[in-house]
Amino acid sequence: MESSSTPLAEYFWIAGVESVSYQDPNSQPAPAVPVESTIIEDGEPEDEWTNGGQPKTNARHSRQNSASRLSKMSLTERFSIQTLDDTDGNTKSNRSSATIRAVNPPDFSNGNDDSNGNSQNPAPSGTLGEGSMFMGDFDFDKALVKFAAEREVFLEDLTFSAGAKVQARAPMVNPRMERIRAEESDSGRLSPLRSIKGSIRRKMSFRDMNSVRKQPSNRISTSRAASIRTTRRLSNYNSVIPPPEPLNTDPDMHPLKRRFEPVLLDRYPPQEAGDEISRRGRFPDYVPMFAFPNDIQIVSSDDRPRSTWHGFTMTSDDNSKLYGITIIIWIALNADVAEDVEKKCEEWRQSHMSEEERELAASLGVRLAGERTHLSQLLAKLPTIPSGSPARERLEDEISTVEEKITLMTDMLRPLRHGAASKIEGLTAGESGLWAPRAYGILGRDAGNMSFWKEWLKAIVTPMTDGSVLRIPPSSPRVGRWQPLERYVVNLCTEAFNPLGSKTQVELGVRELRLYARKEADNEIPGSRTIDIYALFRCLSLENIVALFEYAMAESRIIFLSSHASMLHLACHALANLLYPLKWASIFIPILPARLLSALEAPCPYIVGIERRYDNIELPEDDYVLVDLDKDTIDATSQPVRLPRQARRKLMSLLQVAAPHKLRYGVATGPPPYAMESFPYDAFSTENGSLFRTSTPKSTLGKWVSQSSSGFGEADPPNEIQPPIFNAFASAHVENGKSDRPSTSKSGKTSPQSSVSPVSINFPPMPSTPVSRSDSGFALASTLREKRSGHFGEEKMRRSSSFGVDKHPPFQKPGMPFLNGHQANLSISAISVESQNSVIGGANGGYGGGYAPSTYAQSTLAASTIMPSMQIQPVRNTETTVWVEGHCFNYMPKDNTSMCTICNDLAEGDGVYRCTGCKIVSHGRCLGYCSLICPEAFHADRVRAAFVRCLASLLYTYRKYLGRPSKQQKSNGQLYAFDMDGFIKSLPHDQHDYAAMMRETQCFNEFIHDREMQPANDASIRLFDEIIMAKKARGRSGLATGLSRLSTLRASHGASTYGGFGPARGGSNSKIPAFLGDISDHIWRTASVPLPKGNFPGEYKTIVTRTPARLDRSLMREPRSIQGMPRVEPRGTRGLIRKQVPNMFGTTPPT
């Protein structure tokens, strides 16, 4: 077991709003204070504008001419987003922009007049704001219909986001921007025989950009060391990030639209732990701003807003990165604060709303309460009427009508909520109906631990939800008892250590849960076990994925846009991970705060994510790529530099086999549920199932980079398919050998169907099922929402492909069992429309050949010739088959003994549904809560292999041109010198232009620089070289394994040519290179961190369910180990003396 002195996490922190207070609009602004010298970047000259700058015209940055923008973004006028602390490593202020002090107060008189909802005019004509609406003959139902049809413009003068519903806004239009079409066109230089037709290829505008972007050097090999340092200096945050813009404090703004600056409430280790601070690194100032990228708003909501999560990345001045994960929960404002907010709202109502508008809001509240009462009465009648009877159907229709009316009235009331009381009896949860967010987060230096941190944070905030997360067994001495938050924090940040390699996995416990932190082995792609790529592939089509990859290879300015911050985090990290072996070396900001939007004008490559709800989003004038993750679109100012034709077609072909979730399994496009909120459908489900399992999935990289294209669709053996985890606590019982599960209440609660965020999230609709509405009490609360959303009585058509025949074993022709050593399959042209039944018919298992059927010998069939002629067949829901998130559920009417994987309840006598791929079982009522992809519908390991195979084909001969360095190069520490010109000339004719483009990119220069400076046997260098060797081996013919005496002898001595996977089903004779197939270091021996336990003062439930703004040091215990090194307790006079540990508790700040 390795020893480590690196903690598993550097810091735990809490951020939120310090106090809800509204300054007097008549008060004078604070006098201007010059910017202190501490925020001036080290080594940079004095900034001139700090002594005489012009104030901004509004809260957000306004459009300026190019000269002023470039002047503002110049190198000598940058602020660093890295820590701006004092010499002791800590700032005295806990605010997110503590070191930014405006010289002149901003002038808000001209900005945001229309968006603040401060119009003195009544509602627009045609809306419900007219005075005639309050007459006695007013038809309320017609008003509801009108609102449903015109809700986007309804009362737009009064609508406010307040962290809630995202209103439709004018599209961000740039006259130079165009929609990138998924069309394959010739790229690169054409051969002389094909140059007659030719093509006009648009060049990337950034090459001709008049900016300070890096300039290519013709003598890369002789000046690379210096140029790399220069480029890194240009590409760090100091070069592109301006100071945060001040908050908009317009006195006419509605109190619930007012944004508050997030502050750091507490952290561990605390500021007083000097030795620990120096060892872990200084704590950045801007963490609260990245935790709340759109700042903080008080939300008025009947229900507690949904918990969300996201990650962010911060870069310091030395180009080292800090990674953060935060989970946000919502705290109800206490009565005193809520009363103060209500007073401010009343003052605003008196000065900004007409009497008719206030009367409308009050009337809506009364009508809504009445409809809720009516719904309760109808639900009480539901169990008394037999299922299937006409009366039952009429009652269900009436219930659906009332629910629809309630939904519309709630949406109508939302913009007018400030015209009625904040709390509506019988509707509002909590004591006030006003909520403020609070963030709990982790900072660390290892990006591979981000998924682990996320699941750990979800576990520790579960008791804070006080029952909102369903199907959590009650705590007990046998099952486990919750501990105070402070003890979990010490356990993670002090007692746990970070695993160094694949020999050790670190086990952490939260009650009965066991989480395992792991690292990839040296012969695995970095991040392949820890970085999720499925979310990106669910949002974008394969054509857009490849186009995005091409933009990243060309180092474009890439801007991701989404309504969900967590989706931005997942997409940015997935894209960077797919570039392996190249590394994104430029600006990387997965979540760009709204007050730093002017960084989009940075004249250098970047990958940046912005939320759709930001106000006044202004894109650069040219040279950028806008990727809308919610709408599956890519808009750019120019076409991408396309991959070479053959490489692009083969990549697309492999991706269609590795990621068939949309083509063959009917998965909807859009962010997955786990990218929308922390607990989808109020369940502790996890997309990172391996984190909760002791056993580690086998490495498959060697298999898929050695496999021929024709065998790339081979199905996984059933014993290697890990089913998704829909309840981590239930899986913990299975891991511990416990099968009993205490029953729970509230089992019918589901995520609200309203699309208002973050109060609720609108998930993909539940599929139609033949299940009766009288299944159980679970259905009472859920099926009604399903019917209202159109989930019943409507067949959902999804697209699929005739690829589904891989559910059947391949048919063999009699008398011809082998063709040249390969199995013979039916031709694609022989697949009829009825063949779709084979997709859903394999209920009994079998994992036949997974590639496209063909009569050709598989070794002679190129992947690029298969997919263009592929026939697409629709995926249909039938009476016995339901498709949900890639799962093909078949109805098993006689199965009354299986346990539902989703709700962990036994079958109730009416049968269950079983997935033909991963074998999970579900009640009919639970199908809509299946939020995780089926492992058979998406193969992340093959997707990564497809991209790395593409890059291996582009860089196939690079090692041949690493020669001896010159004396000057040797003095710079180079071991090799790369002949760039020789490498480009050696490539095929159609790859010359693409290689010339790569020559100008920083990521390729870094790739060559690393190989010039490091020996070839270094593990990080050798891995990609071995992948290239596997590509070479794929092109060599060999005997079948079964006919080779040598292979038999090797297998008998544990040296199987297939690395333990057995011969490929597609007939491939590829041999896995020894390095890629070596599993001697794939041990992952468990090193357990002491479990937090013990008694603590105070009432148990009060302590474990609190949502503290500051950590209580009295509830902490001295760490039992320091990053894995145990502290021995003294035992009498002969006992060993306890190792001295610096006090990291500090004192509890005054509340």
From Swiss-Prot:
<feature type="compositionally biased region" description="Basic and acidic residues">
    <location>
        <begin position="784"/>
        <end position="798"/>
    </location>
</feature>
<keyword id="KW-0964">Secreted</keyword>
<dbReference type="InterPro" id="IPR046349">
    <property type="entry name" value="C1-like_sf"/>
</dbReference>
<dbReference type="GO" id="GO:0043657">
    <property type="term" value="C:host cell"/>
</dbReference>
<protein>
    <recommendedName>
        <fullName>Elicitor of plant defense protein 1</fullName>
    </recommendedName>
</protein>
<feature type="zinc finger region" description="Phorbol-ester/DAG-type">
    <location>
        <begin position="886"/>
        <end position="934"/>
    </location>
</feature>
<keyword id="KW-0863">Zinc-finger</keyword>
<dbReference type="GO" id="GO:0031410">
    <property type="term" value="C:cytoplasmic vesicle"/>
</dbReference>
<feature type="compositionally biased region" description="Acidic residues">
    <location>
        <begin position="39"/>
        <end position="49"/>
    </location>
</feature>
<dbReference type="InterPro" id="IPR002219">
    <property type="entry name" value="PE/DAG-bd"/>
</dbReference>
<feature type="compositionally biased region" description="Low complexity">
    <location>
        <begin position="104"/>
        <end position="122"/>
    </location>
</feature>
<feature type="region of interest" description="Disordered">
    <location>
        <begin position="236"/>
        <end position="255"/>
    </location>
</feature>
<feature type="region of interest" description="Disordered">
    <location>
        <begin position="178"/>
        <end position="197"/>
    </location>
</feature>
<comment type="similarity">
    <text>Belongs to the EPD1 elicitor family.</text>
</comment>
<feature type="region of interest" description="Disordered">
    <location>
        <begin position="22"/>
        <end position="130"/>
    </location>
</feature>
<keyword id="KW-0479">Metal-binding</keyword>
<dbReference type="InterPro" id="IPR037516">
    <property type="entry name" value="Tripartite_DENN"/>
</dbReference>
<feature type="domain" description="cDENN">
    <location>
        <begin position="524"/>
        <end position="656"/>
    </location>
</feature>
<feature type="compositionally biased region" description="Polar residues">
    <location>
        <begin position="695"/>
        <end position="711"/>
    </location>
</feature>
<dbReference type="InterPro" id="IPR001194">
    <property type="entry name" value="cDENN_dom"/>
</dbReference>
<feature type="compositionally biased region" description="Polar residues">
    <location>
        <begin position="64"/>
        <end position="99"/>
    </location>
</feature>
<feature type="compositionally biased region" description="Basic and acidic residues">
    <location>
        <begin position="178"/>
        <end position="187"/>
    </location>
</feature>
<dbReference type="InterPro" id="IPR051696">
    <property type="entry name" value="DENN_Domain_GEFs"/>
</dbReference>
<feature type="compositionally biased region" description="Polar residues">
    <location>
        <begin position="744"/>
        <end position="760"/>
    </location>
</feature>
<comment type="function">
    <text>Acts as an elicitor that triggers cell death and defense responses in the host plants.</text>
</comment>
<feature type="region of interest" description="Disordered">
    <location>
        <begin position="695"/>
        <end position="809"/>
    </location>
</feature>
<dbReference type="InterPro" id="IPR043153">
    <property type="entry name" value="DENN_C"/>
</dbReference>
<keyword id="KW-0843">Virulence</keyword>
<dbReference type="Pfam" id="PF03455">
    <property type="entry name" value="dDENN"/>
</dbReference>
<dbReference type="Pfam" id="PF02141">
    <property type="entry name" value="DENN"/>
</dbReference>
<dbReference type="GO" id="GO:0005576">
    <property type="term" value="C:extracellular region"/>
</dbReference>
<dbReference type="GO" id="GO:0032483">
    <property type="term" value="P:regulation of Rab protein signal transduction"/>
</dbReference>
<dbReference type="InterPro" id="IPR005113">
    <property type="entry name" value="uDENN_dom"/>
</dbReference>
<dbReference type="GO" id="GO:0046872">
    <property type="term" value="F:metal ion binding"/>
</dbReference>
<feature type="domain" description="dDENN">
    <location>
        <begin position="658"/>
        <end position="1019"/>
    </location>
</feature>
<feature type="domain" description="uDENN">
    <location>
        <begin position="242"/>
        <end position="500"/>
    </location>
</feature>
<dbReference type="Pfam" id="PF03456">
    <property type="entry name" value="uDENN"/>
</dbReference>
<keyword id="KW-0862">Zinc</keyword>
<dbReference type="InterPro" id="IPR005112">
    <property type="entry name" value="dDENN_dom"/>
</dbReference>
